[in-house]
């Protein structure tokens, strides 16, 4: 085979694939000895193709590798990515959904499409004081929709909040934006779930939110529907209104107010603070309030991926597939 493994890596970099992503998709069984085996070279290319969403045929010759899902994506928000980067991002996400689906224990039920967020909220409130990030994740996994936080990003520059992806009849929610407090991520996951429930994804497609949906106040109809779903799930209202006699002077005042209001409203305090930020376009006060609402900042990605580690049936994967998924999830264990 004319293309060496090192040249293959360089060709992948020319597509915009990050070195971190190439390391993650590279099979753990690869060795210097494999370099001299034609069958190993072919298997290397098929493995990388499956994980990045590349056409296997394009990897066997000397032409530039091409993505299978070039145009099967919707990008919401201001994009700094060119067509090649968009193809890489959507193909990576769709391929990851395919691999994840092997270990998702719950079978996706088509009746999820059109699910009423108020009905889901009512179900969750039977066992929780309000709808929290862990409740949304539990519901999503229970519906057969895995949720993970990407610790390996396919592109060198990460400009993505989250994406909903579909491979055949399998869906997944992939979060990209880091957070230190759970409320913003709860909204992101609920928003992507809204895209899925509202039928915004045809088979083998990705919907990528590049900008912060709440802060953008988009007029895009699909974004409006996903926002409405998320807000009704989290708060019970499509347009929650937070009333003050006068605007909170600082984050401490806002934090105290939403913590008092959370129990009677059955809305998580951080979510209430974010509702104020959305309503008043005052995100500085909102972020200051979040720092007071929660005991301490924490890496929310670890929380999401610990849930995923528990939920996935690891016996469904080969050792190499399991190594790949753990790399994508940041190597999180149950501890």
Describe these PLM feature segments.
Residues 1-335:
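Active-site hotspot residues in diverse enzymes, especially metal/ion-binding acidic/histidine motifs
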């Amino acid at each position: 085979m004319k293309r060496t493994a090192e040249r293959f890596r360089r060709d992948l970099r020319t597509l915009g694939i990050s070195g971190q992503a190439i390391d993650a998709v590279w099979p753990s069984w690869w060795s210097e000895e494999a370099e001299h085996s034609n069958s190993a070279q072919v298997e290397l290319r098929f493995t990388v193709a499956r994980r990045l969403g590349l056409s296997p045929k394009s990897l066997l010759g000397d032409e530039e590798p091409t993505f299978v899902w070039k145009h099967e994506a919707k990008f919401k928000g201001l994009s700094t990515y060119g067509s090649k980067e968009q193809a890489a991002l959507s193909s990576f996400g769709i391929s990851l959904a395919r691999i994840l689906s092997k270990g998702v224990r719950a079978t996706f039920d088509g009746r999820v499409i059109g699910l009423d967020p108020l009905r889901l909220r009512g179900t969750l409130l039977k066992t929780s004081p309000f709808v929290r990030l862990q409740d949304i994740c539990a519901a999503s996994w229970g519906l057969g929709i895995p949720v993970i936080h990407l610790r390996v990003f396919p592109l060198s520059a990460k400009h993505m909040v989250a994406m909903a992806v579909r491979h055949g009849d399998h869906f997944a929610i992939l979060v990209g934006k880091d957070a230190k407090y759970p409320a913003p991520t709860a909204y992101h996951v609920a928003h992507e779930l809204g895209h899925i429930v509202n039928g915004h994804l045809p088979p083998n497609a990705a919907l990528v939110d590049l900008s912060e949906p709440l802060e953008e106040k988009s007029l895009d109809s699909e974004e409006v529907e996903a926002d409405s779903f998320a807000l009704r799930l989290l708060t019970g209202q499509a347009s929650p209104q937070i009333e003050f006699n006068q605007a909170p002077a600082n984050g401490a005042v806002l934090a105290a107010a939403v913590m008092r209001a959370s129990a009677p409203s059955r809305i998580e305090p951080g979510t209430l603070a974010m509702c104020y930020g959305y309503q008043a376009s005052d995100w500085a006060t909102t972020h200051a309030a979040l720092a007071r609402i929660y005991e301490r900042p924490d890496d929310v990605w670890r929380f999401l991926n610990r849930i995923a580690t528990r939920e996935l049936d690891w016996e469904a994967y080969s050792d190499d597939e399991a190594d790949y998924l753990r790399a994508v999830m940041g190597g999180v264990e149950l501890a």
